[in-house]
């Protein structure tokens, strides 16, 4: 697969929010303390990882984007460790220092890949601290394409409305990872990325897909938002826009070890992609893939460009369902294919006994675009068209042979006499047919043309047909 990711190195992003340090103390445990019924952990590994808004910034830097980070820290050893950690990966710190408060720290004690306890070191920040941070961050708006507000309700983003309006007035997109049940503080933002629980806290319980979309549109209007991206764990994520467009993206996670920082990964990949020129739909697909990678890791983690490319390639070759597919599987595969900007070609036929003419025709069809769909008449459909004694090969075998050709990406059956319904649903960019047809007589052609696609006639190789092959076999018996 080609590297279809945008030029992340061109992305310029400012992250503003609650920064913290995630500390991991790890070691074996083999006995219970005589002082209390708790395990004794013999610590042999210490690790610091930037967390919260700092993890968002690290994700952007790891993807290759240019990123600066504005947050509140104390005047302490933890702040120094946090600064060292982000600068080492190319993140520019823009701290507001509050000397009488500790830098927020989450200390986790680990053993055998399990978290035994978490200790939090923090004190809430005041309105004056938050305002000073936002005023300082506003000075960087002219240098960026996208701003992320990473809200963990620790006090960095108490009243960000004026900052959002200032960013939007300068043409800067504002993405928000929200916290709590009050979305009014984010009014006017470009996009919010609540998880389903956060969404329901504001909109009420979701009873169906249609209900989710309806509730989302109400929030878009109420809070003057351009879009909502609702992350839904194993159900993937759903994008709803003020332009009445909805896109559901299924999850791509293979294994889930730790959801720590998954929301950070989603919004960082989304922002980096948008800043690099991706559409909203493209950026959401990339963010979904990034989230699937990070939940397979233990602890707060980042995702690299190489990991994204490899994961997108794996998804492209498996979960999008190459080979023999159902219509629903193919609809999702096409959604992902079009996000990558690939041209889809479609043809159809009985393909009862695959011969050299078929092979050359399918090769020519595939050469017209990037991906080729072959719709195949099922057995009853062939029988109605060709008469008793046909098909020679049942539909399962015919599709298996077609799917084995290098020129064919997807094969699916249809039961009608013509594939018009299937073509009208799939709407390829190019519909091709072999033989002496007129374009206006090709099933599904009108629907494809009406949708902005093309219809093309290709030539079959002379002197080769399934009927002649069958006649020759019968004559030689």
Swiss-Prot record:
Kinase in keyword set: yes
InterPro entries linked to this entry: Bifunc_HldE, Carboh/pur_kinase_PfkB_CS, Cyt_trans-like, PfkB_dom, RfaE_dom_I, RfaE_dom_II, Ribokinase-like, Rossmann-like_a/b/a_fold
Catalytic activity: D-glycero-beta-D-manno-heptose 7-phosphate + ATP = D-glycero-beta-D-manno-heptose 1,7-bisphosphate + ADP + H(+); D-glycero-beta-D-manno-heptose 1-phosphate + ATP + H(+) = ADP-D-glycero-beta-D-manno-heptose + diphosphate
Region (Cytidylyltransferase): 346-477
Binding site for ATP: 195-198
Keywords annotated in UniProt: ATP-binding, Carbohydrate metabolism, Kinase, Multifunctional enzyme, Nucleotide-binding, Nucleotidyltransferase, Transferase
Active site location: 264
One GO CC annotation: cytosol
Region (Ribokinase): 1-320
Pathway in which the depicted protein is active: Nucleotide-sugar biosynthesis; ADP-L-glycero-beta-D-manno-heptose biosynthesis; ADP-L-glycero-beta-D-manno-heptose from D-glycero-beta-D-manno-heptose 7-phosphate: step 1/4; Nucleotide-sugar biosynthesis; ADP-L-glycero-beta-D-manno-heptose biosynthesis; ADP-L-glycero-beta-D-manno-heptose from D-glycero-beta-D-manno-heptose 7-phosphate: step 3/4
EC numbers for this chain: 2.7.1.167, 2.7.7.70
GO biological process, one term: ADP-L-glycero-beta-D-manno-heptose biosynthetic process
Name of the top EC class for this enzyme: transferase
GO terms, molecular function: ATP binding; heptose 7-phosphate kinase activity; heptose-1-phosphate adenylyltransferase activity; phosphotransferase activity, alcohol group as acceptor
Subunit organization: Homodimer.
Family: In the N-terminal section; belongs to the carbohydrate kinase PfkB family. In the C-terminal section; belongs to the cytidylyltransferase family.
Function field: Catalyzes the ADP transfer from ATP to D-glycero-beta-D-manno-heptose 1-phosphate, yielding ADP-D-glycero-beta-D-manno-heptose.
Protein name per Swiss-Prot or TrEMBL: Bifunctional protein HldE
């Amino acid at each position: 697969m080609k590297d279809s990711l945008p030029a992340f190195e061109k992305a310029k992003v400012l992250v503003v929010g609650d920064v913290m340090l995630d500390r991991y103390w790890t070691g074996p445990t083999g006995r219970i303390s005589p002082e209390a019924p708790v395990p004794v952990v013999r610590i042999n590994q210490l690790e610091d990882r930037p967390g919260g808004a700092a993890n968002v910034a690290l994700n952007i830097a790891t993807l290759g984007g240019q990123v600066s980070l504005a947050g509140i820290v104390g005047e302490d050893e933890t702040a120094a460790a946090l600064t060292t950690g982000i600068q080492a990966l190319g993140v520019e710190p823009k701290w507001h220092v509050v000397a009488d408060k500790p830098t927020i720290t989450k200390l986790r004690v680990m053993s055998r890949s399990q978290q035994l306890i978490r200790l939090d070191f923090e004190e809430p920040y005041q309105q004056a601290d938050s305002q000073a941070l936002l005023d300082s961050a506003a000075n960087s708006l002219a240098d960026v394409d996208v701003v992320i507000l990473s809200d963990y309700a620790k006090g960095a983003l108490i009243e960000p409305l004026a900052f959002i309006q200032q960013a939007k007035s300068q043409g800067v997109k504002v993405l928000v990872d929200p916290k709590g049940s009050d979305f009014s503080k984010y009014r006017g933002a470009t996009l919010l990325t609540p998880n389903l629980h956060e969404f329901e806290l504001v909109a009420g319980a979701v009873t169906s897909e249609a209900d989710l979309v309806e509730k989302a549109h109400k929030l878009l209007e109420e809070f003057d938002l351009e879009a909502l991206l609702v992350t839904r764990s194993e159900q993937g994520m759903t994008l709803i826009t003020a332009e009445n467009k909805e896109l559901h993206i299924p999850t791509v996670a293979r294994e889930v070890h730790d959801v720590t920082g998954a929301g950070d990964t989603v919004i960082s990949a989304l922002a980096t992609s948008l800043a690099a020129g991706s559409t909203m739909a493209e950026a959401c697909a990339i963010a979904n893939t990034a989230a699937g990678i990070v939940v397979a890791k233990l602890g707060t983690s980042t995702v690299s460009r190489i990991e994204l490319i490899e994961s997108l390639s794996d998804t492209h070759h498996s979960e999008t369902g190459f080979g023999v597919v159902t219509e629903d599987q193919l609809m999702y595969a096409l959604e992902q294919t079009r996000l990558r900007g690939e041209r889809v070609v479609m043809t159809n036929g009985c393909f009862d006994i695959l011969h050299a003419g078929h092979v050359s025709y399918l090769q020519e069809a595939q050469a017209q675009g990037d991906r080729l769909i072959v719709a195949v008449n099922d057995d009853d459909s062939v029988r109605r068209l060709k008469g008793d004694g046909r098909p020679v090969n049942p539909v399962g075998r015919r599709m298996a042979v077609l799917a084995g050709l290098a020129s064919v990406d997807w094969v699916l059956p249809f039961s009608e006499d013509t594939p018009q319904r299937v073509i009208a649903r799939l709407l390829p960019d190019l519909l091709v047919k072999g033989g002496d047809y007129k374009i206006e007589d090709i099933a599904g052609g009108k629907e494809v043309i009406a949708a902005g696609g093309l219809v093309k006639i290709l030539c079959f190789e002379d002197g080769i047909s399934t009927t002649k092959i069958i006649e020759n076999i019968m004559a030689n018996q």
